[in-house]
């Protein structure tokens, strides 16, 4: 699934597995939208799109407007067709990818798991993997966005 964040004309695309990662995606949306000192604004899908070609067309249009992609990673993330498509399109667009591991109880990742996941990420324009819980994502997601922007 997807969501976008705009920063003074600079947008960020959020790629995630809807069933597994939607809660954290909503948390990021709420954190960003409620922070009055932040320049970020979350843009959300306005209409539910169900057919594959329409989803891909929407993804293509949205990613063309962005410079950054937040990739929320849970156990099943890389098994999802649209997540892979969004990563590919983000790379083709030259986006910086900010991977965030959703390290909750349902997603107990070992260091070996994380190393394997790292190998699935692009080698260029990809920031280090952050952990949503261990790295206090709720408190730090805005800083991670600023860091990626170079602020």
Predicted regions and their residues:
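Glycine-rich, charge-decorated loop segments at or immediately adjacent to ligand/cofactor-binding or catalytic sites
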Residues: 105-122
